[in-house]
Amino acid sequence: MSIDIEKAIVRSIDEIVIGPKRLTKYEKARIVAARALQLAMGAPPLIDISSLQNKDPVIIAERELLLGVLPILIKREKPNGEYQLIPLKILADIERKKVEKLNDIIIKHFGEEHSLL
């Protein structure tokens, strides 16, 4: 069964039918690891890192993921061969909202110095 590539690319969160409507921990781990390896090998960061206290490639990769600047498509596939291509930016928006909520709770209970962002 062949799927037209344009039809397979998701344009909004509502179009996701394969897998959860969020970034899974496995997808996140693979993306962060691959990007951290690229950064460690000398690839330029896609964000301004001057404000980061720690210049560790994993920290930079996680920040790039949260900001949705990585030009990556996630391919989610069913056993029968059907698949969807989901731009990371769509899933990163959901991840960022989740982290912002968690950050608000941390600041409320522990103060600004413990902020995640």
Task: Locate the predicted segments by residue.
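Polar low-complexity intrinsically disordered regions
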Residues: 1-34, 38-117
